[in-house]
Amino acid sequence: MAFEVFEKLEAKVQQAIDTITLLQMEIEELKEKNNSLSQEVQQAQNNRESLVNENEQLRQEQNVWQERLRGLLSKMDEV
C-alpha cells in the first residue's frame, strides 16, 4: 500500500517537473520573442524620428522656395 502511494507521489512529482520544464522553455521562447519585438519597436522609433527630421527639413526648404517665388512674382508685378 505504501509503495503504491509512493509511486503515485513519484508520478505526480515527475509530472510537475515536466510541466515546469515545459513552462521554462516557453518562458525562454517568449523572452526571445519579446527581445525581438523590442528591437523592432526601437528600429521603428528610429525610423520615425528620421522621417520627422526629414519632413521638417523638407518643410523648411519648401518655405525657402516659396519666399523666393514670392520675391520673383513681386518683381514681375513691378515690371
UniProtKB/Swiss-Prot annotation:
<comment type="similarity">
    <text>Belongs to the ZapB family.</text>
</comment>
<keyword id="KW-0132">Cell division</keyword>
<keyword id="KW-0963">Cytoplasm</keyword>
<keyword id="KW-0717">Septation</keyword>
<comment type="function">
    <text>Non-essential, abundant cell division factor that is required for proper Z-ring formation. It is recruited early to the divisome by direct interaction with FtsZ, stimulating Z-ring assembly and thereby promoting cell division earlier in the cell cycle. Its recruitment to the Z-ring requires functional FtsA or ZipA.</text>
</comment>
<keyword id="KW-0131">Cell cycle</keyword>
<dbReference type="Pfam" id="PF06005">
    <property type="entry name" value="ZapB"/>
</dbReference>
<dbReference type="GO" id="GO:0005737">
    <property type="term" value="C:cytoplasm"/>
</dbReference>
<keyword id="KW-0175">Coiled coil</keyword>
<protein>
    <recommendedName>
        <fullName>Cell division protein ZapB</fullName>
    </recommendedName>
</protein>
<dbReference type="InterPro" id="IPR009252">
    <property type="entry name" value="Cell_div_ZapB"/>
</dbReference>
<dbReference type="GO" id="GO:0000917">
    <property type="term" value="P:division septum assembly"/>
</dbReference>
<feature type="coiled-coil region">
    <location>
        <begin position="4"/>
        <end position="78"/>
    </location>
</feature>
<dbReference type="GO" id="GO:0043093">
    <property type="term" value="P:FtsZ-dependent cytokinesis"/>
</dbReference>
<comment type="subunit">
    <text>Homodimer. The ends of the coiled-coil dimer bind to each other, forming polymers. Interacts with FtsZ.</text>
</comment>
